[in-house]
Curated annotation (Swiss-Prot):
PROSITE patterns: G_ERA, KH_TYPE_2. Keywords: Cell membrane, Cytoplasm, GTP-binding, Membrane, Nucleotide-binding, Ribosome biogenesis, RNA-binding, rRNA-binding. It comes from the Bacteria. It is found in: Cytoplasm; Cell membrane. Residues 37-41 are annotated as: G2. It is a peripheral membrane protein. This is GTPase Era. The lineage of its organism: Bacteria, Bacillati, Bacillota, Clostridia, Eubacteriales. Residues 120-123 are annotated as: G4. Residues 149-151 are annotated as: G5. GTP binds at residues 11-18, 58-62, 120-123. Residues 11-18 are annotated as: G1.
Length: 295
């Protein structure tokens, strides 16, 4: 009997949703950064075994939106919990239950599918803190399963996947077995560049960064030639991104190229230009151009 179903991962920003998904898949498909709100789109990734297929929906973290992009991210996360077979609520033991957690859990109470509590980053906590966190969350919601994990190290992740398989109904193979994501290759490329920009810039530039792939061509010898616009909101941000004598932009380009070559499995030439688009996160037309469709 073949089993298949949809699993969505929800939680506050920066609790490790993308890290968990990337570990399960063994591929870097969802942007990972130490900054919150780095996942901006619902990304479906597909894990296929001999007798099962799990379609994961990786979502933006749910938070109080401050601009139209934020509204898109929150609505995207809420929509992802509809018509799924299992919800994984991901959180960390070293953080108290906040308004954001209660907001998410309240929105899940009407769901007919089972909800798991997945307590991530237990390797960074203490047994006492983990136990207290389990007690707190159990008093807020009737979880079907509680699974402590360390996603970055893979601890207990196999156990979590095995439990997920038990929730799958009998069903078809929704995607070909060699397909691991439903997003276009260009999208993954743009996410890689955005992640490297966030990592290189650290706290120097806030989240007002977007990536627009201007050109992506593959030559006869297999080399990809990629041209990218890195979009920011202020002229002062542009100067920071470029850096002294262009050193910061060079660093972003070099780290992006390395990761792109790993993903595309071939040589890559990447050129990055920095463009200022003031208040782009509140510009509905520009958001559409960048792939953030209004919900």
């Amino acid at each position: 009997m073949f089993k298949s179903g949809f699993v969505t991962i929800v939680g506050r920003p920066n609790v490790g949703k993308s890290t968990l998904l990337n570990y399960i898949m063994g591929e870097k498909l969802s942007i990972v950064s130490n900054k919150p709100q780095t996942t901006r789109n619902n990304i479906q990734t597909i894990l296929t075994g001999d007798d099962y297929q799990i379609v994961f929906v990786d979502t933006p973290g749910i938070h109080k939106p401050k601009h139209k992009l934020g509204e898109y991210m929150v609505n995207s996360a809420k929509d992802s919990t509809n018509d799924v077979d299992l919800v994984l609520f991901l959180t960390n033991p070293d953080e108290e239950i906040g308004k954001g957690d209660k907001f998410i859990l309240e929105s899940l109470k009407d769901k007919k599918c089972p909800v798991y509590l997945v307590l991530n980053k237990i390797d960074e906590s203490t047994p006492e803190r983990v136990a207290k966190s389990l007690e707190m969350y159990s008093s807020e919601f009737n979880f079907k399963e509680i699974v402590p994990i360390a996603a970055i190290k893979g601890k207990n992740v196999d156990t979590l996947v095995d439990l997920m398989k038990t929730e799958l109904p009998e069903g078809p193979k929704y995607y070909p077995e060699d397909m691991i994501t439903d997003v276009p290759e260009r999208f993954v490329v743009s996410e890689i560049v955005r992640e490297k920009a966030l990592r290189c810039l650290r706290d120097e530039v806030p989240h007002g960064i977007a990536v627009d792939i201007i050109q992506m061509k593959q030559s006869d010898n297999g080399t990809y030639h990629i041209e990218v616009d890195l979009i920011c909101e202020k002229d002062s941000h542009k100067g920071i991104i470029i850096g002294k004598n262009g050193q910061m932009l060079k660093k972003i380009g070099e780290t992006s190229r390395y990761e792109l070559e790993r993903f595309l499995r071939t040589k890559v030439n990447v050129k990055i230009w920095v463009k200022v688009r003031k208040e782009w996160r509140d510009n509905q037309n520009l958001l559409k151009e960048l792939g953030y469709k209004k919900k």
